[in-house]
């Protein structure tokens, strides 16, 4: 499969929507795009590439391809600094559904990123407010995100920035909505009461302060969220809509997740990619 990124590497000035047949193709595209960005920076500076990372089922295929590239010698994370976007409050780090466990299982234990460059919020910190403030500062001290890789919830939330989160929010403690706990119950024996009630999360403004944002959205359950984020007003009701105001935002989706946008919008995004890759 050929991956062409010249139009993105050179002309990112507004939201782009990359539409692929299915999640497998979209995930491959995202992995190779991330790799291209890491290599691009490495070619011109010794400064580390700073990336924001997400969890959940959506990025697993992307992580798998990044792992394959590292093992094949096509990519290295030795000069990459990562910050994960969220973590549950009160869930032991060793719990199989903690985001610490998830990231080590699906990415960190299989790549060459230095342990000291891996950052994940500590949901068991004695002072979670101080933990959030320190995390936000660490991102800034690292130089800010070169690229933030995120997913989107069925209600349009990014990270754990639930509907009505301020678009100017920063890393903080949040209370999860019942809808989110019910959706995430599939990871907790299908019991919403086992899903922690609170989490630590980077804020909407933390995400949007990244030099570039790449959002993965696959499947029909994400269709309404994408329609609201792409065609609706920018609103704290759909926190992904904040991407409308970002100069370098990209949504990678499949035919199912893009199915509710207007036909004219669909054709526009397909035409833009085709023309700029010509």
What does each of the following model-derived ranges do?
Residues 64-76, 99-101, 163-172, 232:
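A glycine- and small-aliphatic-rich helix-loop capping segment at beta-alpha/alpha-beta transitions
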Residues 8, 75-149, 270-278:
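Ligand-binding beta-strand-loop-alpha-helix segment within the catalytic cores
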Residues 143-168:
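Glycine-rich phosphate-binding loop
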Residues 40-71:
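Glycine-rich N-terminal segment of FAD-binding domains in flavoprotein oxidoreductases
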Residues 5-51:
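N-terminal glycine-/serine-/threonine-rich phosphate-binding loop
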Residues 159-202:
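Class I SAM-dependent methyltransferase SAM-binding "motif I" and its flanking Rossmann-like core
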Residues 52-56, 84, 121-122, 149-152, ...:
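Short beta-strand segments
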Residues 202-205, 209-278:
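ATP/nucleoside-binding phosphotransfer catalytic cores, i.e., glycine-rich phosphate-binding loops
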